[in-house]
Curated annotation (Swiss-Prot):
This is Large ribosomal subunit protein uL1. PROSITE patterns: RIBOSOMAL_L1. It comes from Oleidesulfovibrio alaskensis (strain ATCC BAA-1058 / DSM 17464 / G20). Binds directly to 23S rRNA. The L1 stalk is quite mobile in the ribosome, and is involved in E site tRNA release. Protein L1 is also a translational repressor protein, it controls the translation of the L11 operon by binding to its mRNA. One of its GO terms (molecular function) is tRNA binding. The gene is rplA.
Length: 235
């Protein structure tokens, strides 16, 4: 059983972490339990009733959070011609095609998100083994393979979150910073859950959102009552 430090134990003192809370209470308690000296990120983990080993039950997508993520995101755009000017005007930090691919091959990974136009995806495929494991590979399902680079860059800069269910059927996503306060975090969570709900596979049986937990970077996870998730979505 993992040992926790004094600050963690103090943050959870008097709290039964086995209890399941309403969505709003889980968010509020996770913020109250934050004890790090830095502005921690608030995260959510959602266990979905899907089996990712079947391609038709893979849940993957993206959502632009209404209150952003509270951090500066560096964006790289792989494109050619006039699209390069569009990307720069939209605020892209790094823009290029063959030259950018060569830089990445050389070890340059100074960006948090990557976007590509469809006509250069064969080129970007050369660095798939570098970008893929880091979650940086552009993908049409998440809107990062598109000719509308200006829109894509703007959305990423505004707080666009990409998510993908893991092998265990769990989806992880950031919701912002502790300094946002409970209302803004709850609003971001609502936007995420609405999107995840819309992506429910038709082949998924039984309860879709089975369990959910909200936590901060260093803090404990507060579990949500599964019955309250539906109430929160409909509210």
């Amino acid at each position: 059983m993992p040992k926790h430090g004094k600050k963690y134990r103090k943050a959870t003192d008097g709290t039964d972490l086995a209890v399941r809370f309403s969505v709003e209470d889980a968010v509020a308690k996770s913020l109250e339990a934050s004890f790090a000296k830095f502005d921690e990120t608030v995260d959510v983990a959602i266990c979905l009733g899907v089996d990712p080993k079947y391609s038709d039950q893979m849940v993957r997508g993206a959502v632009t959070l209404p209150n952003g993520l509270g951090k500066t995101v560096r964006v790289a755009v792989f494109c050619k011609g006039e699209k390069q000017a569009e990307a720069r005007e939209a605020g892209a930090d790094i823009v290029g095609a063959e030259d950018l691919v060569e830089q990445v091959k050389g070890g340059m990974l100074d960006f948090d998100s990557a976007i590509a136009t469809p006509d250069v995806m064969a080129l970007v495929g050369q660095i798939g083994r570098v970008l893929g494991p880091r979650g940086l590979m552009p993908n049409a399902k998440t809107g990062t393979v598109t000719f509308d680079v200006a829109k894509a860059v703007s959305e990423v800069k505004a707080g666009r979150v990409e998510f993908k269910v893991d092998k265990a059927g769990v989806l992880h996503a950031p919701l912002g910073k502790v300094s946002f306060g409970p209302q803004k975090i709850a609003e971001n969570l609502k936007a995420l859950l609405d999107t995840v709900q819309r992506l429910k596979p038709s082949s998924a049986k039984g309860t879709y959102m089975k369990t959910m937990s909200v936590s901060t970077t260093m803090g404990p996870g507060f579990k949500v009552d599964p019955n309250d998730i539906r109430r929160f979505l409909e509210g």
